[in-house]
Amino acid sequence: MRIAWDLFVHDSQLRWLGPEKGVEHMAIGAVLSALWDIKAKRAGKPLWLLLGEMEPEELVSTLDFRYMTDALRPEEAVAILKEGQKGKAERIKHLLEVGYPGYSTAPGWLGYSDEKMVALAKEETQVKGFKQIKLKVGQNINDDLRRLSKAREAIGPDVRLAVDANQVWDVPTAIDWINKFHDFDLAWVEEPTSPDDVIGHATIARAINPIKVATGEQMQSRILYKQYLQANAFGIMQIDATRVAGPQEIVLEYLLAKKFNKPVCPHAGGVGLCEAVCHFAMFDYVAVSGTMDGRMIEYVDNQHEHFVHPTEIKDGNYVAPTAPGNGTEMTLETAEKYLYRG
């Protein structure tokens, strides 16, 4: 797997298109994800279990530490994974029995009326069992304050409430806006400004404490994660299963998060993202962080019908996949319908 990584990521001509960022990097990620899917299927294991049961030295040998050793060295990664072997069997058993916490974005879209938002907030928490919901914010401060007040009243004090600005603010505006949210006991504010602005996020994080900054779904490489962590620029780290170059880079990001003691709450929601990203959160629980505390996976209830093994939710938790592979195999009907035929 390391040979495949080096072949694509460090190709001297492909690097002119990046390096290690953008569509080129995401395309490499698709190829490497397919290779890991094949490896997991040959082993007869879901990807999370394949990764979780690999020997530390073997897994670390697949990772690329170029540009990373000022933050994480290979021997540190091996030590983290060896420490993660303690209690692994019990965590696998717990994961298969209980699942992994999810949270719902369903109530939060800006186009919804207050009545629809409140009804969905109650349904997602009281009926479906989610312990956190997330609302979009950033268009109008008065609308945000009203909607947050109604949402908090609807879900009560024991359900977590997060907000997502989708990069809409500059740094001073973010600080001013978010500091009006302190009464709502927010779990985090997501993507307050440009995902490339490490210093801006660090400035916001200091200014809005104790509200936590969450970001990461748009980060284009492990190198940017390294800088965010070194700058203490967020409280909650997020990943996306398709933004970077496949499982090897995502595993390295989780190891970085462990080194810097940051919880990871993955982004999901697009076609296949729930199916894909849950494997990495579960791998983290089994083999890296060893905990679900402060960790959950985003869930959006659409587009799952396109997959052979769609995501299952039970009592607000992701059911651990047991089918071999990475979970993103599409049905034949969908593949034939949407195949690009040139």
Tell where the protein language model's regions lie, with residue ranges.
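N-terminal capping/lid subdomain adjacent to the active-site entrance of alpha/beta enzymes
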Residues: 1-161, 166-175, 179-183, 303-342
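Flexible, glycine/charged-enriched surface loops at secondary-structure junctions
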Residues: 47-50, 188-192, 267-268, 291-294
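Flexible C-terminal active-site loop/helix
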Residues: 248, 252-256, 269-342
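Short, charged helix-to-loop "capping" segments that act as catalytic/coupling loops
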Residues: 110-115, 126-129, 206-210, 286-294
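Residue-level recognition of hydrophobic positions within alpha-helical transmembrane segments
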Residues: 28, 33, 186-187, 236, ...
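Catalytic core of soluble alpha/beta enzymes
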Residues: 126, 134-275
